């Protein structure tokens, strides 16, 4: 933990596993249920600790931040601001995108409430950490998100789903079918195991990339093919502030105005955005609206020209 996170051992690490209940006095009969993000109508950690196993700071036995999260999800009493304060949207969506793409059915974001770690750095936000991903690349028709309690409640919110779509699109366009980077990696792996009796089944993965592509595009849906477009008309105005509306495809992480760092972008759906607080000077304004990726690199740009007229005299 300390290798990957600053003071990582001071955070809360939970291992996700089945909950088991013994149903007979002799211990021979038992029942299990998947771990999930359900709230059990109790803030008592005993209700959660058998499927969310404490693996750091065990002596503290502090489940308060975890229970705060599942209570918000389970009661559906959260909005974008409050849930993003508790949960690391990007880390959760990256994990779900990868495990969904490779059809890792044996984990919590798909069909089994286990085989992952849930981690919260001290003073930070909850994230899923990959673990035990050996049931992969099998069923190209597998779902990308499962139906365990709380999973869809979180990931189907448009302000979360947009980021899941984005990271899945990153996989599709950069790291899977026809990816030079992945082809180079597979070649190096082939050379590394030569003569060992181990074979690198590159053809299996190439076939997977081809067969999984359409399913991934269908899961993303219309955002995969939405145009990058400004919908606001450029009629002359006397206002000093401007708001623009538009749409973007799933290749775009955020929207900005070149040179205007105070402008704020708000997403109203998985594709529609509103950019407010744009400052206008008197005369013609040549604005550049930029769609950027998670690294701030420009993916799309479109010019928007608008004239600000002089204010009318009182």
Task: For the regions a language model picked out, list residue spans one by one.
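Short secondary-structure boundary/capping segments
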Residues: 5-10, 117, 143-146
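Internal "kinase-insert"/substrate-recognition segments embedded within catalytic cores
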Residues: 1-97, 101-102
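Extracellular/luminal Pro/Thr/Ser-rich low-complexity repeat and linker "mucin-like" segments
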Residues: 153-154, 234-247
């Amino acid at each position: 933990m300390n290798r990957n996170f600053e003071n990582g051992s001071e955070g809360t690490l939970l291992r996700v596993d089945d909950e088991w209940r013994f149903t007979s006095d002799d211990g021979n009969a038992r029942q299990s249920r998947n771990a999930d993000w359900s709230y059990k109508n109790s803030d008592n950690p005993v209700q959660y600790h058998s499927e969310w196993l404490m693996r750091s700071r065990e002596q503290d036995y502090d489940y308060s931040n975890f229970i705060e999260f599942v209570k918000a999800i389970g009661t559906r009493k959260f909005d974008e601001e409050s849930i993003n304060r508790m949960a690391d949207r990007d880390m959760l969506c990256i994990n779900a995108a990868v495990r969904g793409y490779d059809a890792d059915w044996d984990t919590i974001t798909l069909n089994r409430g286990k085989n992952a770690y849930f981690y919260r750095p001290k003073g930070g936000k909850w994230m899923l950490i990959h673990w035990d991903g050996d049931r992969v690349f099998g069923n190209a028709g597998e779902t990308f998100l499962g139906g365990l309690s709380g999973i869809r409640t979180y990931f189907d919110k448009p302000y979360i789903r947009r980021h899941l779509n984005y990271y899945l699109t990153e996989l599709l366009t950069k790291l899977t079918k026809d990816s030079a980077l992945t082809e180079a990696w597979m070649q190096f792996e082939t050379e590394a195991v030569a003569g060992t009796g181990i074979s690198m089944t590159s053809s299996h993965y190439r076939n997977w990339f081809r067969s999984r592509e359409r399913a991934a595009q269908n899961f993303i849906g219309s955002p995969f093919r939405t145009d990058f477009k400004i919908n606001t008309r450029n009629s002359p105005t006397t206002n000093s502030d401007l708001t623009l509306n538009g749409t973007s495809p799933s290749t775009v992480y955020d929207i900005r105005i070149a040179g205007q760092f105070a402008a704020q972008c708000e997403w109203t759906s998985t594709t529609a955005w509103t950019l407010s607080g744009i400052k206008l000077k008197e005369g013609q304004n040549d604005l550049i609206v930029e769609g950027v990726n998670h690294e701030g690199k420009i993916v799309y740009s479109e010019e928007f020209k608008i004239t600000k007229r002089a204010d009318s005299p009182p």
